Swiss-Prot record:
Keywords: ATP-binding, Cell shape, Cell wall biogenesis/degradation, Cytoplasm, Ligase, Magnesium, Manganese, Metal-binding, Nucleotide-binding, Peptidoglycan synthesis. ATP binds at residues 134-189. It catalyses: 2 D-alanine + ATP = D-alanyl-D-alanine + ADP + phosphate + H(+). SUPFAM superfamilies: Glutathione synthetase ATP-binding domain-like, PreATP-grasp domain. It comes from Pectobacterium atrosepticum (strain SCRI 1043 / ATCC BAA-672) (Erwinia carotovora subsp. atroseptica). It is an enzyme of class 6 (ligase). Its cofactor is Mg(2+); Mn(2+). The gene is ddl. InterPro entries: ATP-grasp, ATP_grasp_subdomain_1, D-Ala_lig_Van_CS, D_ala_D_ala, Dala_Dala_lig_C, Dala_Dala_lig_N, PreATP-grasp_dom_sf. Mg(2+) 2 binds at E270, N272. This is D-alanine--D-alanine ligase.
């Protein structure tokens, strides 16, 4: 049977616009390699008919809910279509930052101190009692929805008086929210391709933190690859990335994000099971450092589909 690849993009999540950019870049890379690939916007096209339309493989370029949360992966498993990235369980788990942290904690991997809060607790708890839950974390804080990507709904809190507004913003996007200790050091990210850990990247946003604008819109964010770590630090970070990736049963490809705190210790932030593939994206940057062109990278990811 002749290979016909569906590049799933767009969708209906808060990350739709980024997904459209990722998907078009992936599509161009696959076509450059001579692969019969077609863009499929899951907002408009029923994925249940992919097999009927003659597709034999799926490259998932969707971000956020409905694309990397296990839902789509379950449908593709049912259809018997090979797809890129992690399976149902790993996709569902890593979409939820709280549950991912809990798994990492259980196996002894480093995560920043945090408090989890659900909407019911938030609505039922008196304001002063609510604020008292977070005092042991110190200031500043970072507030984020548990199940959003691309820093959607995320806020930095410098004083406790700013916390209610930050919680309101996070609860606009999810019923579960994380309030974490602010880590003051630089952010690093490590891409994984099959069983290979790619070189780390150090991220230096122009603003307060690596938010949506810094990730996708700003040309002022600086990226360093090589990241400037010593060989010993690079090896330790690579080992930590792979341990975190395997602890949540990821496969195929992905990206693990870290913060380096003022105590020179790395803390895990999250795993991305369907990382961005835009002109600002990090996995292609790390792959270039290993000598892979963008087209070679997307072909390799497709070859890892299961």
């Amino acid at each position: 049977m002749t290979e016909k690849v569906a590049v799933l993009l767009g969708g209906t999540s808060a990350e739709r616009e980024v997904s459209l950019l990722s998907g078009q870049a992936v599509l161009a890379g696959l076509k450059e390699a001579g692969i019969n690939a077609h863009a499929v916007d899951t907002r408009d096209f029923p994925v249940t008919t992919l097999k009927e339309e003659g597709f034999t493989n799926v490259f998932i370029a969707l971000h956020g809910r409905g694309g990397e949360d296990g839902t789509l992966q379950g449908v593709l498993e049912f259809l018997g279509l090979p797809y890129t990235g992690s399976g149902v369980m790993a996709s569902a788990l890593t979409m939820d930052k709280l549950r991912t942290k809990q798994v990492w904690q259980a196996v002894g991997l480093p995560v920043s101190p945090y408090v989890a809060l659900d909407r019911r607790q938030y609505l039922d708890t008196e304001a002063n009692t609510l604020l008292a839950q977070f005092t042991h974390l110190g200031l500043p804080l970072i507030v984020k929805p548990s199940r959003e990507g691309s820093s959607v709904g995320m806020s930095k809190v410098n004083t406790l008086s700013d916390l209610p507004a930050a919680l309101e913003e996070a609860f606009r996007h999810d019923d579960d929210v994380l309030v974490e200790k602010w880590l003051s050091g630089p952010e690093y990210t490590v891409a994984i391709l099959g069983d290979e850990v790619l070189p780390s990247i150090r991220i230096q946003p122009a603003g307060t933190f690596y938010d949506y604008e810094a990730k996708y819109l700003s040309d002022d964010t600086q990226y360093f690859c090589p990241s400037g770590l010593s060989d010993e630090q690079e090896q330790a970070l690579a080992a930590l990335a792979m341990a975190a990736y395997r602890a949540v049963d990821c496969s195929g490809w992905g990206r693990v994000d870290f913060m380096l705190d003022s105590d020179d210790a790395f803390y895990l932030l999250e795993v991305n099971t369907s990382p961005g593939m835009t002109s600002h994206s990090l996995v292609p940057m790390a792959a270039r450092q290993r000598g892979l062109t963008f087209s070679q990278l997307v072909v390799k990811i497709l070859e890892l589909a299961g």
